[in-house]
């Protein structure tokens, strides 16, 4: 049976192509907000980090009514680091709206999310967004998107997909660029016409595959999934079949049931085939679990999630300043928080190590792990992390394989030489180079994942902030040999204390400082970057010796350059293999793993 009064769609796109803004506009024009209601920009991005970075990390569910048809919309992350989210939520929908920037065209992560949709044989609608941009080239972008579909072996149904031209910012969609540009009606009607209605059998035993987990401090864990067969109702007795151990079956009762309307979850008594529902009251529900009838407990196969490619060690902070700024500082606190993250993030892996105070955390990329670190920091955790390392595989002959990436770089023509030189040093191979479009050339590289660790900051410096770097995981390939990372050494504090202008003034002649006057430092803490290859120890807490013949005002004449304040991402990129990042709610500090200078030298030459 088909539910003709329901359509389930996911909005997929490369990061920053405007899909969250498009969903905002669909919500506004469907009439879910009151006329006098103030609506924030990118209302679907609810997490603080999402708003600050302008990216979507967690998939979001919403529902709108259009001409008596309920359209359930899922806004998905555009960054491949959060691809585990995309892969799961696509199981809930029958079609996707692929949003493509009218200037940039299809990008690496467009390819990533589209490939996942095609593997599931979903219907596709292409929305060419930002057609109001002066440099927009919609006709060429249509051709590029069709080429991408052919490259990904799309079927006839998907190659025959409709194209809608839109400006989410201006609030219009049209099927013809020369036609009327009034509202989003053409997009709504295309969705209803081209996306198939969800199908299922209401007479069969209940099946709901949990695709996402939400958490609410009042009701606890909330499982979100689509009703594939049967009917779900409040107070119904069900069986939860565990995703990883199908023999493990737990009897539960549905206490609360919700559907999505606009930005809200609305309580309902029951839900039919094809509905996307949120279920609360089941304490240890996990992603991939199936909720079934007591009589016919049959699990739905769970989508295999791509494996992690990089790892970091998360450990207890043991620096001299440990425990002064964090609320949660013990090994048990860190362990509980990391294992709790596994409940909602299927792409993450956490392993206990031989050292009780350290945990190996593996994820899909530096951004994936940096978002976890930032969330923990904001929640009051204090801990330390190591430099990111890639996860190697070995083939049947014992040959070492490493994760590879496709890097697509848009850069002003004058910087192409510097980019090619740097990426070649990092074992990158130039696959394709497209002539400048609007002054920008496009370079495509195949490069080991470890070749990109720590490169983004260097890239922004080399391109004076004008370059755009996008990457996509491209499987495993033969190990490419050693890569030399940072060429500059570290400036290391020699003793504990507070930094003083006089000490910093002498230190800044040796390199770039990361600290200003009046900051707490300790021996072994990295306080800057040298201009040379070796590390330099320096006393930044040293004050000027007092004499009877001091020139008036000579101390005031000491001019300090402003310190370079590193963001979390920059600090993660900067640290070397013998360094750690100390994370607290108030500060991010870089330090040597071995703080004692004598022991550090001994370890280096042993």
Regions from the language model: what does each represent?
Residues 39-42, 152-164, 198-209, 238, ...:
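Interdomain boundary/hinge elements
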Residues 123, 133-193:
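Canonical P-loop GTPase G-domain recognition
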Residues 167, 353-368:
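Short glycine/threonine-rich beta-strand-turn micro-motifs
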Residues 231, 282-284, 363-369, 412-416, ...:
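Helix N-cap motif at beta-to-alpha junctions
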């Amino acid at each position: 049976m088909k539910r003709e009064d329901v359509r389930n769609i996911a909005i997929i796109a490369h990061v920053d192509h405007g899909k969250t803004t498009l969903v905002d506009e669909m919500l506004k024009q469907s009439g879910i907000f009151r006329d006098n209601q103030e609506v924030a920009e990118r209302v679907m991005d609810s997490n603080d980090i999402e708003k600050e970075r302008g990216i979507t990390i967690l998939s979001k569910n919403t529902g709108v009514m259009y001409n008596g048809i309920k359209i359930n919309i899922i806004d998905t992350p555009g960054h491949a680091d959060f691809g585990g989210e995309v892969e799961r939520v696509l199981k809930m929908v029958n079609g996707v709206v692929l949003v493509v920037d009218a200037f940039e065209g299809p990008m690496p992560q467009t390819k990533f999310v589209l490939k996942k949709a095609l593997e599931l044989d979903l219907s596709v609608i292409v929305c060419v967004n930002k057609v109001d941009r002066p440099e927009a080239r919609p006709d060429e972008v249509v051709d590029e998107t069709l080429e991408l579909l052919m490259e990904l072996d799309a079927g006839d149904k998907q190659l025959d997909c409709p194209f809608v031209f839109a400006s989410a910012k201006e609030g219009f969609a049209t099927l013809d660029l020369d036609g009327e540009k009034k509202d989003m009606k053409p997009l709504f009607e295309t969705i209803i016409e081209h996306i198939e209605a969800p199908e299922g059998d209401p007479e069969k035993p209940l099946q709901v595959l949990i695709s996402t987990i939400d958490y609410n401090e009042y009701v606890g864990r909330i499982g979100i999934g689509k009703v594939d067969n049967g009917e779900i109702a409040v107070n119904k007795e069900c069986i939860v079949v565990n995703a990883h151990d199908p023999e493990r079956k737990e009897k539960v009762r549905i206490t609360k049931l919700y559907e999505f309307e606009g930005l809200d979850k609305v309580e309902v008594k029951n839900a039919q085939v094809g509905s996307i529902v949120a279920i609360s009251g089941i304490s240890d529900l996990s992603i991939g679990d199936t909720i079934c009838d007591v009589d016919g407990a049959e699990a739905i196969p769970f989508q295999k999630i791509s494996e992690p490619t990089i790892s970091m060690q998360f450990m207890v902070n043991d620096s001299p300043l440990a425990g002064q700024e964090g609320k949660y500082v013990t090994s048990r606190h860190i362990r509980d928080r990391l294992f709790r993250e596994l409940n909602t993030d299927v792409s993450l892996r956490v392993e206990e190590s031989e050292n009780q105070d350290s945990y190996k955390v593996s994820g899909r990329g530096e951004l994936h792990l940096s978002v976890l670190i930032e969330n923990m920091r904001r929640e009051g955790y204090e801990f330390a992390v190591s430099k990111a390392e890639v996860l190697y595989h070995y083939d049947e002959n014992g040959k070492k394989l490493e994760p590879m990436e496709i890097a697509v770089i848009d850069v002003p023509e004058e910087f192409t030489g510097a980019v090619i030189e740097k990426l070649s040093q990092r074992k990158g191979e130039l696959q394709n180079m497209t002539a400048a479009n609007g002054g920008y050339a496009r370079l495509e590289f195949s490069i080991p994942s470890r070749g990109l660790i720590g490169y983004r900051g260097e890239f922004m410096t080399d391109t004076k902030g004008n370059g755009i770097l996008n990457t996509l995981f491209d499987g495993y390939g033969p190990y490419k040999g050693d890569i030399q990372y940072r060429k500059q050494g570290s400036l290391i504090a020699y003793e504990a204390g507070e930094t003083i202008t006089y000490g910093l003034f002498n230190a800044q002649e040796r390199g770039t400082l990361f600290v200003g006057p009046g900051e707490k430092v300790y021996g072994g803490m990295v306080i800057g970057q040298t201009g040379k290859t070796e590390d330099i120890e320096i006393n930044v807490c040293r004050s000027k010796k007092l004499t009877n013949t001091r020139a008036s005002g000579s101390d005031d004449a000491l001019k300090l350059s402003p310190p370079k304040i590193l963001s979390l991402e920059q600090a993660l990129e900067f640290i070397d293999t013998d360094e750690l990042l100390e994370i607290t709610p108030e500060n991010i500090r870089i330090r040597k793993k071995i703080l004692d200078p004598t022991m550090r030298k001994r370890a280096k030459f042993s």
